[in-house]
Amino acid sequence: MATDTGSGRGKGGKGVTLGKGSKGAKASKGGKRIRTKTQQDALKGITKPAIRRLARRGGVKRINGAVYDETRNVLKQFLEQVIRDSVTYTEHAKRRTVTAMDVVYALKRQGRTLYGYS
């Protein structure tokens, strides 16, 4: 009879438990802290290889090192504007959930019509 090694690959199992009366991240002073992502960390999530793949798709052969940070900043500005417009459409419709059509209308407003989401 095999014993469970706790690797998480066996039958059943309870997974990670916090213990009786535990409060998760606030469990005790000596507990492991949960690190929240800062905005800078989130921008670094768009990796150099991902930017390189996008550039290759656009026909770029060589990339200067300064391009990566600039690409992240431009992408951040673009997404902020699209999200801001999408939320405006959502609020005008008195909803709390942003729909795909809100994003389509926001892109259309910026002159970037997206087809296929009607």
UniProtKB/Swiss-Prot annotation:
Ranges where the record places region Disordered: 1-39
GO BP term, example: nucleosome assembly
Single Gene Ontology MF annotation: structural constituent of chromatin
InterPro entries for this protein: CENP-T/H4_C, Histone-fold, Histone_H4
GO-annotated cellular components: nucleosome; nucleus
Keywords, in A-Z order: Chromosome, DNA-binding, Nucleosome core, Nucleus
Chief site of localization: nucleus
Claim: Nucleus is one of the keywords in the record: yes
SMART domains on file: H4
Gly residues biased stretches: 7-22
Pfam hit, one: CENP-T_C
Subcellular location: Nucleus; Chromosome
Family the entry assigns: Belongs to the histone H4 family.
Quaternary context: The nucleosome is a histone octamer containing two molecules each of H2A, H2B, H3 and H4 assembled in one H3-H4 heterotetramer and two H2A-H2B heterodimers. The octamer wraps approximately 147 bp of DNA.
Function statement: Core component of nucleosome. Nucleosomes wrap and compact DNA into chromatin, limiting DNA accessibility to the cellular machineries which require DNA as a template. Histones thereby play a central role in transcription regulation, DNA repair, DNA replication and chromosomal stability. DNA accessibility is regulated via a complex set of post-translational modifications of histones, also called histone code, and nucleosome remodeling.
UniProt protein name: Histone H4
Species of origin: Entamoeba histolytica (strain ATCC 30459 / HM-1:IMSS / ABRM)
